[in-house]
Amino acid sequence: MATTVYGQASLPQMHSLFSKVRPFLSHSPSFTAPFTRRRSFPFSALPTTKAIDAALMKEKWLDSLSLTSQDEDTTPENAESSCIIGIDPDLSGALALLKFDHLGSSSFAQVYDTPHIPVLVGKRVRKRLDAKSIVQLIQSLDVPSGSRVYIEQSNPFPKDGKQGWYSGGFGYGLWIGTLVASGFCVIPVSASLWKRHFQLASGSCTKDDSRRVAAELFPSLSSQLKRKKDHGRAEALLIAAYGEALKTEKLLIQPKELLSQVNYLENQLVEVK
C-alpha cells in the first residue's frame, strides 16, 4: 500500500459513508451548535436579552476562528470536490481528511497521526506537538482555503494534573492558531456532542468502541485502527464524519438563526402581554 511521508495510506476509498452515518442521525438527539451542551434552546432558563448576548458572543467567537465569513462558501465553482477535516488535538490524536465530490457519490479519507517531538521538562522527557511538522502536514493536504475544520474542544479533568492541563491547552491552542493562520474555518466541537451522535457517550463505551465504529464507517482504513493506541485516528475520523453530517443534514444552527428565533419569541411575549 502506498504511504505518505507521515506513514498513512494514500486516499483509500471510503465505503458508503453517508449510508452509514445517516442511521446514527435517526437515533441521535437533536443537536445545537458546537459549544452548546443543552438539547434545546435555553429560553426558559435565560431572559431573552441574555440569550441574545450569548448568541452574539458565540458568533464573535466563531468569527474569530476564521479569516473568512462563516456563511461564505469559498469553494471555487469549478472545484470537483469539497473537504472536511476532523482533529483530535491530543498528543495521541490525529488529523482526518474527508473529500467528497459535489454529488456525494464518491468519497475518500486519509488519517495522519499528530506530529510530536520529545522535550526535556525538568528531569523528565515529555512529548510536545511539533509545530513545524503540523504546518508542513497542513500545507501538504492541498485543501481549499476556507474549508471547515472540526476540532474537539479541550476540556481538562482535575485528575489530569498540571502537566496534562498544560499539554492539552498548549496543543489545542497551537492547532487553532495554525489552522486559522492557514485560512481554515475552525469549528470547536465538544466531545459529548460527537460521541452522542455515534452513540458512544454512555459510561460503558470505551476508546475501543470508537475504533470499532470508525472501522465500520471507514473499512478501507480498518488496518490503521487495529491497535489500542490508534484511538486518536478513530476519533479524528469520527469528528470529521460528524462535521460532514452537520453540514449535510443542516443540523448546525448558526447564531443568526438563533437570533431570529429569539426575536420571534420576543414578539410572541409582546402579543401575550
Swiss-Prot record:
Its cofactor is Mg(2+); Mn(2+). InterPro entries: MOC1-like (IPR045290). Disruption phenotype: Albino phenotype and decrease in cpDNA copy number. GO terms for molecular function: crossover junction DNA endonuclease activity; four-way junction DNA binding; metal ion binding. GO terms for biological process: DNA recombination; nucleoid organization. Keywords: Chloroplast, DNA recombination, DNA-binding, Endonuclease, Hydrolase, Magnesium, Manganese, Metal-binding, Nuclease, Plastid, Transit peptide. Its EC number is 3.1.21.10. Residues 1-53 form a transit peptide. It catalyses: Endonucleolytic cleavage at a junction such as a reciprocal single-stranded crossover between two homologous DNA duplexes (Holliday junction). Its main location: plastid. The keyword Transferase does not apply. RNAi mutant displays chloroplasts with no chlorophyll and aberrant nucleoid morphology. This is Holliday junction resolvase MOC1, chloroplastic. The lineage of its organism: Eukaryota, Viridiplantae, Streptophyta, Embryophyta, Tracheophyta.
